[in-house]
């Protein structure tokens, strides 16, 4: 498992970046899409694969400061 930063590219949505623990970049995107689907009462997520970019895997020692992972 790795930590990935999933970045929202489409400013139409909340614009929040998400840190996700996943096996791959694609799984990290899918987890975020599933999150937005749940926020949409289980209906198809308005957020698509094309709305997201993924950085990572992120190594915790790459960060100089402590931070909240959302």
Predicted regions located by residue number:
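Short amphipathic alpha-helices within nucleic acid-binding modules
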Residues: 27-31
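Glycine-centered signal
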Residues: 1, 25, 61-62
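Residues marking helix boundaries in flexible regions
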Residues: 4, 22, 32-34, 59
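A short, exposed loop/beta-hairpin motif centered on an aromatic-Gly-Thr core
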Residues: 13-24
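A structural detector for beta-sheet-dominated domains
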Residues: 7-9, 23, 55
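Short aromatic-glycine-(Arg/Gly/Cys) micro-motifs in beta-strand/loop hairpins
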Residues: 1-15
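Short, mixed-charge low-complexity intrinsically disordered segments
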Residues: 34-70
């Amino acid at each position: 498992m790795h930590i990935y930063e999933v970045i929202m590219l489409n400013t139409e949505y909340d614009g929040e970046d998400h840190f996700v623990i996943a096996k791959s970049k694609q799984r990290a995107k899918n987890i975020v899409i599933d999150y937005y689907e749940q926020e949409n009462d289980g209906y198809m997520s308005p957020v698509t694969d094309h709305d997201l970019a993924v950085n990572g895997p992120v190594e915790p020692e790459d960060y100089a400061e402590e931070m909240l992972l959302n």
